Amino acid sequence: MLIKIKIDKTNLFMYNISKVIYMTKLILIPNKKELDIDVDAYLLGIKDLSVNMPVYFTLEEIKNINTDKEIFISLNKNMHSNDLKLLEQTLIELSKLKIKGIFFYDIGVLNIVKRLNLNIPLVWAQEHMTTNYETINFWYNEGVEYTQVSEEIKEEEIINIKHNTKSKLIVPILGYFPMFVSRRHLKENYLREFNLKDNSKINYIEKEGKTYPIVDENVTTVYTSSYLNGIKEYLNFKKENIEYVLINSFLIEAEKINEIINMFKTVTNENIEEYNKEISNILDNNIDTFFLHKDTIYKVK
């Protein structure tokens, strides 16, 4: 669309505003309760209703947060029947706050929000299922405003989704991310079976020369062996007006995450190669782009 703007009696300028450019915002999953890192938004987990988070907040702590940053809440647990009362009470309380969105895995979250007519935006976050725009559009038409895109599809597929949906996209861009989740306490069962004792919060699995962090809390989670580093792809996502990218600070020290955040905020085509190398050095050269440039092929061994 062309708009004429009259500057004075003799000059007319023509502006093409057919495409509006938005800023791609940075969401951080923090590994501490102090929200003192300069990002656009935080994704916070709530005790007993979230999984795969480095740190968990109580509802009262959420209520007392004083920040100008956007706050997303993760209620991404696969809920049990005995979770539903707490879940409903929590959603009611969260609907009274200035929450940007609720990440959910269990469809029960959506059902409760619709049944109670709660005014709270939702984020479809069924990690390994958010792979195509047709399903994303289905949930968008059900009232789900955002989608956390799977880490298991290529950059071009993410961009294709963006071109074919009205859903606001949140794309994982850096950090360790969950690769496998089990309701069973696999580490605890292993220790019990062999009469071993280990009070470590985080353990590691060695497999074919790679090391995978494993956390056994309310569920057992195995994380990727390397950090996802998508800073190069981030520039392309910005060009495509993708609304958010997600950084997970799990096992990254505060000083390092600050350096990385600053690079994401100042990256350009001119410094991208330098920044990519710097992030690799910061993360001990243990980085990968995973499926961003690989076809999604699963092999059973």
Features from the language model and the residues they span:
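Short, positively charged and aromatic/hydrophobic N-terminal segments
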Residues: 4-9, 15-19
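Active-site pocket-lining/capping segments in soluble small-molecule metabolic enzymes
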Residues: 20-135, 148-301
